[in-house]
Structure formats: structure tokens, C-alpha cells
Curated annotation (Swiss-Prot):
Origin species: Clostridium botulinum D phage (Clostridium botulinum D bacteriophage)
Annotated stretches, region: N-terminus of receptor binding domain (N-RBD), Hcn: 863-1082
Pfam annotation, one family: Toxin_trans
UniProt region (Ganglioside-binding loop), positions on chain: 1235-1245
Name assigned to this protein: Botulinum neurotoxin type D
MF-aspect GO terms: ganglioside GT1b binding; metalloendopeptidase activity; protein transmembrane transporter activity; toxin activity; zinc ion binding
Positions of region (Translocation domain (TD)): 443-862
Active site: residue positions: 230
Lineage: Viruses, Duplodnaviria, Heunggongvirae, Uroviricota, Caudoviricetes
Length: 1276
């Protein structure tokens, strides 16, 4: 529904409808009622300034009152004309909000989000209509005084700005109560303070891309985004999910490190900004906030069911109306008794909308405007714009007017390109400064060496102690310990298109009868002043270096110097880190050749700033920018001065001024009640512990990502900002010198070359933009490298210690209860050992769906791709090398391509050969000294069980090189030198009885070689074996690689290989996992072998937790039956998967697809359905929150809801599984928990069931199902 936005003039008279006089006691500036305009339902605009200070003043204060930049103008909104402009400006912005679907939905949420009539102190059976958190008094001037005549219950009041015009806020109206309804689900009305004509500015310095035409620059925020940001705070307040102020990130402030003395950054702000910065809040805390909100909403639903009274009692006739209003607001359902209840799916959708979808990052993408990349982005001098002028700002385009070409690169927001964006007077701006002073001797301090740095020019680095430490606490595990799983990933399109917000909501009349509210006497707030900070340093740091590069005002004789000290001592000298530039600039114009001189100067500068270096010792980054060191004097005293050498020696941590060494505290231990004596409770405790172990790994990874985003990336981004400043200062000096020389130039061509001179100066900005792209790439690679190389190994090391302790405790628990657990001891120990066999991979995309972070990681991944010297891919049904080196690839006639996956090939008979001849241009050192080989392989059972040795990949000539062999279920990598001395790596991949092996399954093999160290063998990203190879003699590598099975005579002996790559670098463990994640195709559901699961194909189905049993019908109910022969996988009743949406026959099944399962039974097909009758966990029990349903067969193959399932991919190192969900009557359940005979009435078999409390089962292996297809590689 689109709510119309009404037009008003400030001079319009009060009308007892949508123009009223309201008394706002929170505003200490105005003690009389103020004129208010309802521009759309429940949203009022009051064109007045606002202050809650005890002694309010709009004048510029003597000292900063904000740690951010402040701007003061006491005359703003002092006239009716200005108030009219403000009113119409807000109206125009609301009309612009209504231009997009996301904006319409925002307004809709605000309109129907009236705060609850009451709070936690209100009796649970009562609506209280006298609360100041919901009501505003309406007054009229009668008989010489103001009198209250009515009330209104608005959602939002929009005032003009605070004394600091740049301080946009959305505050609450509280009555001195101890609790806060905005935190407790009830909600409160919201008061906004905004100034839409005054615009914050930011730079795109840290963005991934910028135009080579317009270059990087300073941009202003679109006022519609600034307003929507504050309205999102209002949403959180109205819906009672506002986050308390103690949930925040504190800045790290220390004597020896330069970071912002900034305010605490509230979680509320990070949610409202959205995007990448939300990931700073650890997942565990985000889940807790959601659970808290869910609990509050359940309490409110309970209240609604009990309410039968009102305050005042005369309003009792309104009970049903307000019950309807609040049930629509919270999206409650009614159960079969007519009571209001929370629908979990609807709650999740609403909560996701309010906390994820409604955010500044999403708004800016939907309105196609330029916006700051991070919440911590640096702000610059604000600007002013007349947004009422359609020649400047329109409802459709904002500042980026198409008719002026301002839509290109958002140049309408570019303060250098759009003359309508007027810079504010710096005299009215107040900044907080850090005074930096050079300590001349140990005890000597000289103020003449001090410089002043704006607080917002320092990086914001979070205090690590302000990031949740809960994962480091000890935890007691019982049979009742649950894992709460909630994903805050969201689909924007689904959110915009869904119909969750009521289409025709119940609406209250704007003007309501007076309810005689108690007077609200709120005390004013005391103004807090901040003082500048002084810090002493022992050397000229980056702030001194930047200061030395600034151009002084009114200097007539500019010279460049390569001495920082000299530049700091003389106003006419500018420091440059480019000696050749200083020489050319200082030489000046010779023999009247002005244009030649100017061209030489510009060319020297632009050539130097585009330089990049590569160092063989650095494998972490593709290039380095050598002049960053002399531009900013980065690094410690031992390494300062030689940036390249320092970087090669110390790595990326060398760039971090503060806290370069990442540390992780010891993880808390899991403990168990040793007194447990019930068999089922012990088993359940073990299962819960394994689930909690997985959660501990995920929480630890999330904690690491939070630290990286809030403590590391902010420091790296700060280098970007400083380098942009540095290059801009250099360009300013060059421009000023060109202007001075041009002013003195008296040549006859002076006027003719004027435009060329201007073009030269403009070209500096373009080249700075290109240089910044290189710098950004370098800095981003450094940041990601720090995550993967400095942080991840330490986290995994601590997790491995935690695993060792936990596994030991679990085995001890089983051993100490072996009598009670008779018959289950071996199975439980095997399950524990298997669970702890592999570490959980770190896939950063599991912790964020932010597009910017994905771009950064993909860029890092591309640097891995850049090192490929062979990459076999299928193009137009031919196997070719796509590495760029164009190796010759010859495929034998009998080789089958693209048999299972796009880039695979099948080898069977001895005549099947693929011969690859590498490009001769590949350097010897590049292919061997640091090299890696990776590929996916699938080896048939008969080839595995053979006792012969088969060479399957061979690159040995004249007794030297490498090869890959198979023998007795082992895969062996052999590296051999010219003297036939060799080293080998061996991995046993053969099938075990517990189905944990790799026979005939796809698995990922990586071998890395380093001639000065080790060669290593990885399987699915896990290091399995390493061997020193530095004692080998010379290894001559053949440029020919032959794929084939030597001496093969059995037609059932075959193998498949896909995605074969050779890299000219030693891939790290993190690199390998990135390649693995990029090739595993998680969106494609896999069968037991790792092949794509397909529709209209027969499968045998087994449960991962009960691999010794197959699924079969018994009395029309599905049960698990013991295998008569565990080596026979093709046992039982085959299942065919059918598509609900008529997908192409035999097409791949994707993650989340809806499916129907048909089972062949007694030569007839049946549909598997979920029974509609509940099986109770204890016979005769009641179905409450833990309903259990059996699976059964139905002869009718129609498309019925109880037979529709959705499927989700589960991939775990050496097994491919799926989870299956049942959707029926809006009650989503997971097929999980094999219910054992003693647990309910089915006495003779283990039975698969559907359970409603599926959130606690998502990590349980009893919910993992495997589909076994008849495969040529497994012949029975």
C-alpha cells in the first residue's frame, strides 16, 4: 500500500485534523505548543529547532560538544520562510521515498507501527492510553492561555536539527520509568531531529572501483538516505527492538597508538547502516538479540489474549480495535482457540526486514545513489544545497540529474562537479583535535614541534574487549542443551515483494479525546564538553609527513624538498617523496618553454605514482606500492626507510601501527554432569556436545571476522585515506607551482595554451584516481592476507586444542558409562572419532552475504588464479588450457569428456590417454621452486581394490620429474630427482565399513612443493602428509604430462578427473580452501558419490547416523532395516526424485528445490508423505512444541502438500549428504531424529520421522540423508 504524502504551506491554518498545535515538553528551546503537520498517516513534521539541554543555546560553543564534526548556525529555522522551506523539503523527501518499493514498505511499517498502549509496568490485562511514550497533547489557545483539548498517537515526529546541525538523531519519549519500552517489544513513538539541506560528505577512496574519467573525489550524502537512516532508528523504536546503549563497540584508546577518541559505536547504528559492518557484531550476539525480541513478542501476544481493561476505563470500547492494530503490527496468527500466537516464520521475516533489509546500504543501492562504503568512513567539510529547487534536486533522480549529465558516476553528488553543493564556512565548524608533539629528548618537550590532527582523521579501532567474549567461557552440556540456529541472510527481492505489511490496516483517527495525562517534567540534559588530546611521539610519524606535504596559503615561491624537517620548518617548502619530481619542479621554466616544463612535471608525477613492484619473497600480495613508505613513514624504527625490504621481512603486519600481533584467548571447556545414569540422556548429551562443538567452531570464526572488520580493516583503510591525502597534497603543490609559473610566463602563446594548462592540471586528478585503484588493491590484499595468514591459523590452533580436550572428555564419558551404554559404546566412540577427525573449513561467505566483502575475497581468489600455469577446462566439448599459457592438449579417441561435470574426463582402458605439452615460455624456477597441483578425482571400486600399481598422471622424463600412482587403495605422489632419488606422499582413500572412505567418491587433491622446504599432500583442504624435500638433488621437470591408467585390463577399473590445475606458487592452506570452496559447487545437491543429484533418477537412501541400515516400508510406514550385507549398497526399495515445478527431466537438483519422493514397492510406485497424525514421543503424551510425525507411503501420486519436501545441501569433507524439509499447513519440519523402538509404539524398527523443533536438529547427523545411485564405478 502506498500512503499519499500531502502538501502544506507553513502559513496554513490549524484545522483540527492534520495541522495542530502540539506541546513537546522534551524540547527545552520552546516552552509553548508548536505547529505540526501530518504529512502522511501518523507522521508529523514540526519545523522548529530542538534541544533537550538544561540551558539550551543554538550558538557555537566555546569547546567541542561532540567527538564528531559539528556545525552551528543559530539563525537556521528562525523565520517563517525558513520553516516553510524545511516543511516542504521534508515533504519532497517523503515523496522521493515513495518512489521506490523499499521506501513504500518503510513508510508502511512506520504507519502501522504504533507503539503498544502500555509497557512492562502495565497490568497484563490492561491497555494504558495515558502513556507519554505513545501520546502527544494537542492544545488550543483559548481565553488567553493554552489548554489541552485532545491527544494524538503518532509514530514519528520530525523536528528541525539540534544546536549541532549535523547531529541527526532519533530519540525517545520516556517518563522517567526504569524500563524502556523500545527495548522490550512494546515500542515508543520517535522524535527525529534532522536538517535535510545540510549534507555530510565522504570520499570514495576505499571503494573497489572508480572512474578513470572523473576520478576519486568527495561526495555528499543524498538527503533521502540520511532521512531514511533516522527513520530506520524510528522503526526499531516503534517495534520495540531498539538495541540498548550498552551493546556497543568501544574505541581502543592508548598512549602509544593513534586512534579516534571516538564515541562508542552502538550495535543499533551498525544494524541501521547495514552491509559489511553488521558483521562486526558477532553472530552469537545477533542471535541473542533476535531471541530476546522473539521472547518479547510472545509476551505481547499473551498480553493481547488477556486484555479486558483500559486506562481510562471510558476507552474500554476500543479494546478490539487496538487488538487488531497490534496483531497486524506484530504479524500475529491465531491458533485454533482464537488466541494470538507468534508465527516463527512470520516473525523471522519481520525481524529480518527491520534489522537487515531496512538499512542505509540497501537504501542507497535501491535509489542508485553514491554512499559511504563503511560506517567508519571518513567525513569531510559538510555542504549545503537547496533541495527544493528542481534544477538541483528532483524526486526521481535526487542530485544525479539526467538532463545535466549528473547521472554519470553520480557526479551530481560530487562536490567538485556540482556547483549547487556549497561548502559551509569553516568558521562555524567545530572539530575535536589530537595535538601531536615530537619529544626532542627523553624529558624534553617543545610545543613548536606540535601539529594538530582532527579527531576524525584518525582511524577508528575497536577495543577487543568490547567484542563478545562469550565463546571463551566454560559451558556445561546436558541432554537438554540446544543449538539455536538463525540466519540473518536475506533476499531483498523477496522482502520487497512479500505481502507482510497489512494492505488495509486498521487506522486510528488522528485526533483522539483527551485522557488527562500526568504532566511530563523531564529534567534537561547537561552539556558535555570535550578537550583536545595531546600525544608525544619519538619520531616524525605519518601525520607529520602529511603536514609537511600541505600547501600553505598565500605562498609566492613554492619549492619541493625531499626533507620532511625542512618542509616543516619553512612555509614555502613542500615535502615530496619523489626526488625526480622535486628536481623538475624546482628547475622551473627554462628558455620560455613553459608548456614543455609543465608537461615534464606532470608526466614525472603521474609516471612515478603508477609504479608497482613485485618481490619474489612475497607470495601474499600480487604487487606492492613502493612509495607508500616514504609518503607516510610507515613501519617500526628498525625497518623504516626501505619499504620493500621491510615488507618482505615483516609481511603485511608491518603496515599496522596498532596491535599487529593478533591473539586469541583460550577457549572455554565443555563439561558434563558425571551423575547422568539414564541411557538416552547420556546419548543425547553426547549428540548435543557434538552439535555444540560445531557451533563453537562457527562462533570462533565469526569472532575472528568481527575482530578483523573492527580492528584490522579500519587500520588498512586508514592507509588508503592517508595516501589519497598525500597524493592530493602533491597534486595541489604541482598545480600551485604551475599557476605561479604561468602567471610569470610572458610568452606570446600564453592565452593559446591556457586550456592545455587546465587539462594538464585536471589530468593529475585522473592519474591519482588510477594510482588509488592500485593502492586499494594492494591494501585490500594486505587486509585479506592478514585475515588468512595472521589470524586464521591462530584461531584454528586454539580450536584444535579445544577439540582435543573435548574429545577426551567425551570418550571418558562413554567409558565411565559403558555398562549403561552396552551395545552402543562402539558406535558412539566411532561417531565421536569421526566427528573430530576433520576441522571445520573456514568459508568466509558463510559469515556474510555482503557483496563488497565477497568482491574483496574474490579479488584475493583471482590472485590465486593469476598464478595458474595450466588449467584444463572444457570449452565447446574440447579440453583446453585456460591459464593463458595455451598448453597443447591432445585427447585420445576413447577418452570421454564432460561425463558428470563440465570440466571432467573419464579414463578406463589403457588406450585412454590425454597428453599435455606445457608452454616452453614457462620458467623452470616458476614451475618447480614454488608450485602446486590441484584436481578432483573419483576412483572406481575395482581400481581401488586392485593390488597392482597404476600410474595415472605422469610427468617424468629421463628419470626425473613427478607422477601420481594408485596402489592398494592408496594414492601416491612421487617426486624424483636426476639421480633417481625420490620422495613420496601417500594417502589411503579406500572405503571403510563406516562409509567414511573415498572409494568411488569425488575428493579434492592438492600437492604443494617448495624446494627449500616441504612437499605437502592435502585432501579436501586438509593437510594429510608432508615430507622434507630440500635434500633432493636437481629435479628436471618434463614439459609433458600424460593422463592415463597404465596396463589397465579390467573394464570396471576406471577413474574420473576434473578441474586439473598447476600453480606457479606454493598454495597456503587458506589458498587451498579458497580453491576448494570455489569448485565444490555447494548450490548443487550431491548424491553419495559426489555426483549431481538429478530428477527422475533412482536412488537408494540411507541415514548418515545409521549407515548399517537402509530405508524400507513396513505396514506402509517407512523404517530402517539392518543391511544383510554391509558391502552391498544397492539394497532396499529405490526412490525416484520428482520435480514439483516441472523442471527438465534428469536436470540437476539445486539447493532449496521442492521435490516429491516416489518409492518402488512391490513393483508399484508410491509417494512418500508425512503422516498427518502425530506420534507422541511417549505413548499417550501430548503434542506441544515437539510434535513427531512418521513417514508413510501413499498410492495416489498426485502433487499433495504433505508429499512436498524441500532439500538442502550438506557437504562435509568426505561425505555428501542432504537435509530434507517438509512443508505442510505452514508448519516447516525437518526429517530428522531416527526414533528408536523403545522411544514409542513402533517396537520392531528404527523409524525416520519429521519433527517440528527442527532448529535444534540442523547440525545433527541423524538429519543427514545420503542418496546412492547405481554408479559404473561401484559394481556389485
Amino acid at each position: 500500500m502506498t500512503w499519499p504524502v500531502k502538501d502544506f504551506n507553513y502559513s496554513d491554518p490549524v484545522n483540527d485534523n492534520d495541522i495542530l498545535y502540539l506541546r513537546i515538553p522534551q524540547n527545552k528551546l520552546i516552552t509553548t505548543p508548536v505547529k505540526a503537520f501530518m504529512i502522511t498517516q501518523n507522521i508529523w513534521v514540526i519545523p522548529e529547532r530542538f534541544s533537550s539541554d538544561t540551558n539550551p543555546s543554538l550558538s557555537k560553543p566555546p569547546r567541542p560538544t561532540s567527538k564528531y564534526q559539528s556545525y552551528y548556525d543559530p539563525s537556521y529555522l528562525s523565520t517563517d520562510e525558513q520553516k516553510d522551506t524545511f516543511l516542504k523539503g521534508i515533504i519532497k523527501l517523503f515523496k522521493r521515498i515513495n518512489e521506490r518499493d523499499i521506501g513504500k514498505k518503510l513508510i508502511n511499517y512506520l504507519v502501522v507501527g504504533s507503539p503498544f498502549m502500555g509497557d512492562s509496568s502495565t497490568p497484563e490485562d490492561t491497555f494504558d492510553f495515558t502513556r507519554h511514550t505513545t501520546n502527544i497533547a494537542v492544545e488550543k489557545f483559548e481565553n488567553g492561555s493554552w489548554k489541552v483539548t485532545n491527544i494524538i498517537t503518532p509514530s514519528v515526529l520530525i523536528f528541525g536539527p539540534l544546536p549541532n546541525i549535523l547531529d541527526y538523531t532519533a530519540s525517545l519519549t520516556l517518563q522517567g520509568q526504569q524500563s524502556n519500552p523500545s527495548f522490550e517489544g512494546f515500542g515508543t513513538l520517535s522524535i527525529l531531529k534532522v536538517a535535510p539541506e545540510f549534507l555530510l560528505t565522504f570520499s570514495d577512496v576505499t571503494s573497489n572501483q572508480s572512474s578513470a574519467v572523473l576520478g576519486k573525489s568527495i561526495f555528499c550524502m543524498d538527503p533521502v538516505i540520511a532521512l531514511m537512516h533516522e527513520l530506520t532508528h524510528s522503526l526499531h523504536q516503534l517495534y520495540g527492538i531498539n538495541i540498548p546503549s550498552d551493546k556497543r563497540i568501544r574505541p581502543q584508546v592508548s598512549e602509544g597508538f593513534f586512534s579516534q577518541d571516538g564515541p562508542n559505536v552502538q550495535f543499533e547504528e551498525l544494524y541501521t547502516f547495514g552491509g559489511l559492518d553488521v558483521e562486526i557484531i558477532p553472530q552469537i550476539e545477533r542471535s541473542q538479540l533476535r531471541e530476546k525480541a522473539l521472547g518479547h513478542y510472545k509476551d505481547i501476544a499473551k498480553r493481547l489474549n488477556n486484555i479486558n481493561k483500559t486506562i481510562p476505563s471510558s476507552w474500554i470500547s476500543n479494546i478490539d480495535k487496538y487488538k487488531k492494530i497490534f496483531s497486524e503490527k506484530y504479524n500475529f496468527d491465531k491458533d485454533n482457540t482464537g488466541n494470538f500466537v507468534v508465527n516463527i516464520d512470520k516473525f523471522n521475516s519481520l525481524y529480518s526486514d527491520l534489522t537487515n533489509v531496512m538499512s542505509e546500504v540497501v537504501y542507497s543501492s535501491q535509489y542508485n545513489v553514491k554512499n559511504r562504503t563503511h560506517y567508519f568512513s571518513r567525513h569531510y567539510l559538510p555542504v549545503f544545497a537547496n533541495i527544493l529547487d528542481d534544477n538541483i534536486y528532483t524526486i526521481r533522480d535526487g542530485f544525479n540529474l539526467t538532463n545535466k549529465g549528473f547521472n554519470i558516476e553520480n557526479s551530481g553528488q560530487n562536490i567538485e562537479r556540482n556547483p549547487a553543493l556549497q561548502k559551509l564556512s569553516s568558521e562555524s565548524v567545530v572539530d575535536l583535535f589530537t595535538k601531536v608533539c615530537l619529544r626532542l629528548t627523553k624529558n624534553s618537550r617543545d610545543d613548536s614541534t606540535c601539529i594538530k590532527v582532527k579527531n576524525n582523521r584518525l582511524p577508528y579501532v575497536a577495543d577487543k574487549d568490547s567484542i563478545s567474549q562469550e565463546i571463551f567461557e566454560n559451558k556445561i552440556i546436558t541432554d537438554e542443551t540446544n543449538v539455536q540456529n538463525y540466519s540473518d541472510k536475506f533476499s531483498l527481492d523477496e522482502s520487497i515483494l512479500d505481502g507482510q505489511v497489512p494492505i488495509n490496516p486498521e487506522i486510528v483517527d488522528p485526533l483522539l479525546p483527551n485522557v488527562n495525562m500526568e504532566p511530563l517534567n523531564l529534567p534537561g540534559e547537561e552539556i558535555v564538553f570535550y578537550d583536545d588530546i595531546t600525544k608525544y611521539v619519538d619520531y616524525l610519524n605519518s601525520y607529520y609527513y602529511l603536514e609537511s606535504q600541505k600547501l600553505s596559503n598565500n605562498v609566492e615561491n613554492i619549492t619541493l624538498t625531499t626533507s620532511v624537517e625542512e618542509a616543516l620548518g619553512y612555509s614555502n617548502k613542500i615535502y615530496t617523496f619523489l626526488p625526480s619530481l622535486a628536481e623538475k619542479v624546482n628547475k622551473g621554466v627554462q628558455a620560455g618553454l613553459f608548456l614543455n616544463w609543465a608537461n615534464e612535471v606532470v608526466e614525472d608525477f603521474t609516471t612515478n605514482i603508477m609504479k608497482k613492484d613485485t618481490l619474489d619473497k612475497i607470495s601474499d600480495v600480487s604487487v606492492i606500492i613502493p612509495y607508500i613508505g616514504p609518503a607516510l613513514n610507515i613501519g617500526n624504527s628498525a625497518l623504516r626507510g626501505n619499504f620493500n625490504q621491510a615488507f618482505a621481512t615483516a609481511g603485511v603486519a608491518f603496515l599496522l601501527e596498532g596491535f599487529p600481533e593478533f591473539t586469541i584467548p583460550a577457549l572455554g571447556v565443555f563439561t558434563f554432569y558425571s551423575s547422568i545414569q539414564e541411557r538416552e540422556k547420556i546419548i543425547k548429551t553426547i549428540e548435543n556436545c557434538l552439535e555444540q562443538r560445531v557451533k563453537r567452531w562457527k562462533d570462533s570464526y565469526q569472532w575472528m571476522v568481527s575482530n578483523w572488520l573492527s580492528r584490522i580493516t579500519t587500520q588498512f583503510n586508514h592507509i588508503n585515506y592517508q595516501m589519497y591525502d598525500s597524493l592530493s597534497y602533491q597534486a595541489d603543490a604541482i598545480k600551485a607551482k604551475i599557476d605561479l609559473e604561468y602567471k610569470k610566463y610572458s610568452g606570446s602563446d600564453k592565452e593559446n595554451i591556457k586550456s592545455q594548462v587546465e587539462n594538464l592540471k585536471n589530468s593529475l586528478d585522473v592519474k591519482i584516481s588510477e594510482a588509488m585503484n592500485n593502492i586499494n588493491k594492494f591494501i585490500r590484499e594486505c587486509s585479506v592476507t592478514y585475515l588468512f595468514k595472521n589470524m586464521l591459523p591462530k584461531v584454528i590452533d586454539e580450536l584444535n586444542k579445544f577439540d582435543l580436550r573435548t574429545k577426551t572428555e567425551l570418550i571418558n564419558l562413554i567409558d565411565s558409562h559403558n555398562i549403561i551404554l552396552v551395545g552402543e559404546v562402539d558406535r558412539l566412540k566411532a561417531k565421536v572419532n569421526e566427528s573430530f577427525e576433520n576441522t571445520m573449513p573456514f568459508n568466509i561467505f558463510s559469515y556474510t552475504n555482503n557483496s563488497l566483502l565477497k568482491d574483496i575475497i574474490n579479488e584475493y581468489f583471482n590472485s590465486i588464479n593469476d598464478s595458474k600455469i595450466l588449467s584444463l577446462q572444457n570449452k565447446k566439448n574440447a579440453l583446453v588450457d585456460t591459464s593463458g599459457y595455451n598448453a597443447e592438449v591432445r585427447v585420445g579417441d576413447n577418452v570421454q569428456l564432460n561425463t558428470i561435470y563440465t570440466n571432467d574426463f573419464k579414463l578406463s582402458s589403457s588406450g585412454d590417454k590425454i597428453i599435455v605439452n606445457l608452454n616452453n615460455n614457462i620458467l623452470y624456477s616458476a614451475i618447480y621452486e614454488n608450485s602446486s597441483v590441484s584436481f578432483w578425482i573419483k576412483i572406481s571400486k575395482d581400481l581401488t581394490n586392485s593390488h597392482n600399481e597404476y600410474t595415472i598422471i605422469n610427468s617424468i622424463e629421463q628419470n626425473s620429474g613427478w607422477k601420481l600412482c594408485i596402489r592398494n587403495g592408496n594414492i601416491e605422489w612421487i617426486l624424483q630427482d636426476v639421480n633417481r632419488k625420490y620422495k613420496s606422499l601417500i594417502f589411503d582413500y579406500s572405503e571403510s565399513l563406516s562409509h567414511t572412505g573415498y572409494t568411488n567418491k569425488w575428493f579434492f587433491v592438492t600437492i604443494t612443493n617448495n624446494i627449500m622446504g616441504y612437499m605437502k599432500l592435502y585432501i579436501n583442504g586438509e593437510l594429510k602428509q608432508s615430507q622434507k624435500i630440500e635434500d633432493l638433488d636437481e629435479v628436471k621437470l618434463d614439459k609433458t604430462i600424460v593422463f592415463g591408467i597404465d596396463e589397465n585390463i579390467d573394464e570396471n577399473q576406471m577413474l574420473w578427473i576434473r578441474d586439473f590445475n598447476i600453480f606457479s606458487k606454493e598454495l597456503s592452506n587458506e589458498d587451498i580452501n579458497i580453491v576448494y570452496e570455489g569448485q565444490i559447487l555447494r548450490n548443487v545437491i550431491k548424491d553419495y558419490w559426489g555426483n549431481p543429484l538429478k530428477f527422475d533418477t533412482e536412488y537408494y537412501i540411507i541415514n548418515d547416523n545409521y549407515i548399517d541400515r537402509y530405508i524400507a516400508p513396513e505396514s506402509n510406514v517407512l523404517v530402517l532395516v539392518q543391511y544383510p550385507d554391509r558391502s552391498k549398497l544397492y539394497t532396499g526399495n529405490p526412490i525416484t526424485i520428482k520435480s514439483v515445478s516441472d523442471k527438465n527431466p534428469y536436470s540437476r537438483i539445486l539447493n532449496g528445490d521442492n521435490i516429491i519422493l516416489h518409492m518402488l514397492y512391490n513393483s508399484r510406485k508410491y509417494m512418500i508423505i508425512r503422516d498427518t497424525d502425530t506420534i507422541y514421543a511417549t505413548q499417550g503424551g501430548e503434542c506441544s512444541q515437539n510434535c513427531v510425525y512418521a513417514l508413510k507411503l501413499q498410492s495416489n501420486l498426485g502433487n499433495y502438500g504433505i508429499g512436498i519436501f524441500s532439500i538442502k545441501n550438506i557437504v562435509s569433507k568426505n561425505k555428501y549428504c542432504s537435509q530434507i524439509f517438509s512443508s505442510f499447513r505452514e508448519n516447516t519440519m525437518l526429517l530428522a531424529d531416527i526414533y528408536k523402538p523403545w522411544r514409542f509404539s513402533f517396537k520392531n524398527a528404527y523409524t525416520p520421522v519429521a519433527v517440528t523443533n527442527y532448529e535444534t536438529k540442523l547440525l545433527s547427523t541423524s538429519s543427514f540423508w545420503k542418496f546412492i545411485s547405481r554408479d559404473p564405478g561401484w559394481v556389485e
